[in-house]
Design a protein with these regions (language model features):
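Hydrophobic transmembrane alpha-helices of multi-pass small-molecule transporters
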Residues: 59-62, 175-180, 209-213, 287-290, ...
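Small-residue-rich hydrophobic transmembrane alpha-helices
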Residues: 47-107, 145-164, 264, 277-340, ...
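N-terminal transmembrane alpha-helices
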Residues: 5-37, 41-42, 58-70, 74, ...
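Transmembrane helical elements of multi-pass membrane transporters/channels
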Residues: 16-35, 137, 171, 204-208, ...
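Transmembrane alpha-helical core residues of multi-pass small-molecule transporters
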Residues: 54-57, 101, 170-175, 200-208, ...
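Helix-loop-helix hairpin linking two adjacent transmembrane segments in secondary transporters
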Residues: 140-144, 148, 152-156, 164-210
Length: 420
């Protein structure tokens, strides 16, 4: 297989796998930040519309986690046990499941776009129109995102994080070129605005997926993805194994997003600037959680392979090393958000009211960054052991508490109370 994570120095092995994954996660953050920076030139109403549409692409990632997490953990554990044939079977089942769910989500999104966007009760007509346009395109072609996430997980399970990184790098460059061209329409190009942003993002996702798929075909190296058949019947053993690990993760991801949607709906009562702030603020914050999540993905594969091989000492040492790394990163992000909120906000907003709102948001969320990084790392470790149900129960229980707390604090403190 591409990479054996059960041998060699623990920290070096883990870091070698983690750095490309964290870099890929950072590129994912840049995807979104690039969009927001260009869309910000269209005004806060356009940003608010994309923010609403982005909630549904985020929700889809929770569903996609079923195939990604289930496939990644099962494949990595099989590799650790030396069961290459079963690893291939789980990989094929994961890709098939991702393709099916991606197409199903796209179809439902196209049929119910009006109802989905209507949930947020956007009072501004321009923001509502932007949300409709973005959602139809970004969710209507969401299958590329489903496939990309799952292929990334399966590459990572084999100890190969460089291929997804290179694919994402090319996708980012594509997105950065297409964004200003399609959004602003310089020269002979038409100004597509929010629609252009959605087209640029989907095109980049399609390119990333294609590169990872072609790498399997072109390279001569052994890969569990070689020879998969999308239309073959999925054996119950493989489907059940993926769902057993993947469903709790998917439920956790979708529940978290659904709760965020409820909070966004509460925030929308304070105007388009507030919604835009929450959307952009979330993208800025993703510098923290995407990096931690990327390290958690590396730790997940590391632990799954070593757990499958019965090397629990490496499992424990790998977790401790990861915890220190992401904890320090979280502290640095906290300092940046709390000490320099205005310079950060001014990158994305150009209206005084929106900048002031964003400054308050960044300071509030800044205090939780280190804790969040530790949480994501621990979830990655437990998931590598196959304990996804425990992670799901704990996460959903405490995340759900955000709604009553937002109602109480929002009533006492206004908009800032919801964010606290």
């Amino acid at each position: 297989m591409e990479g054996n994570l059960t041998k060699g120095p623990i920290l070096r092995t883990l870091t070698k796998l983690a750095i490309p994954i964290m870099a890929s996660s950072f590129l994912g953050t840049l995807y979104n930040i690039t969009d927001m920076a260009w869309i910000g030139l269209l005004g806060s109403k356009a940003v608010a519309g994309v923010g609403v549409g982005g909630m549904f692409t985020w929700f889809s990632q929770g569903l996609a986690a079923m195939a990604r997490m289930g496939g990644q953990v099962q494949v990595a554990q099989c590799i650790g046990r030396g069961e290459k044939e079963k690893a291939h079977g789980f990989a094929q089942a994961a890709v098939q499941l991702a393709a099916f769910m991606g197409m199903a989500y796209a179809l439902l999104s196209l049929v119910f776009t009006k109802q989905m966007v209507g949930f947020f009760q956007l009072a501004d007509a321009e923001a509502h129109a932007a949300a409709m346009s973005y959602t139809k395109i970004a969710c209507g072609l969401i299958v590329f995102s489903f496939m990309t996430l799952t292929l990334t997980g399966l590459y990572t399970a084999q100890g190969d994080s460089k291929t997804p990184f290179l694919a994402n790098l090319i996708g980012l460059v594509t997105n950065m070129i297409l964004d200003p061209v399609l959004i602003l329409g310089p020269g002979p190009f038409p100004k597509l605005g929010v629609t252009g942003a959605a087209i640029a993002t989907v095109t980049a996702q399609a390119i990333v997926m294609s590169i990872m798929a072609l790498a399997v075909i072109i390279r001569k190296k052994e890969n569990v993805l070689k020879g998969i058949h999308l239309l073959a019947k999925i054996p119950r053993e493989y489907l059940g194994g993926i769902c057993r690990i993947g469903i709790p993760t998917a439920v956790q991801g979708m529940a978290y997003c659904a709760i965020s949607m409820v909070l966004t709906r509460m925030v929308s009562g304070y105007g388009a600037e507030a919604v835009a702030t929450q959307r952009v603020g979330g993208q800025i914050e993703s510098i923290s959680w995407n990096t931690a999540d990327g390290f958690a993905a590396a730790l997940n594969a590391f632990i799954a392979q070593n757990y499958g091989a019965g090397k629990m000492d490496r499992v424990k040492k790998g977790y401790r090393a990861s915890l220190w790394t992401v904890g320090i990163w979280g502290i640095l992000i906290t300092l940046a958000f709390v000490c320099f909120p205005r310079p950060i906000a001014e990158i994305f907003f150009h209206e005084p009211k929106a900048i002031t709102t964003a400054v308050g948001y960044l300071i509030i969320i800044g205090f939780s960054e280190a804790f969040m990084c530790v949480e994501l790392t621990t979830v990655g470790a437990l998931s590598g052991l196959g304990r996804t149900k425990l992670c799901s129960i704990i996460s959903i229980t405490f995340t759900s508490a955000r709604i009553p707390l937002a109602i109480i604090l929002g009533g006492l403190m206004g908009l800032s109370g919801i964010w606290w």
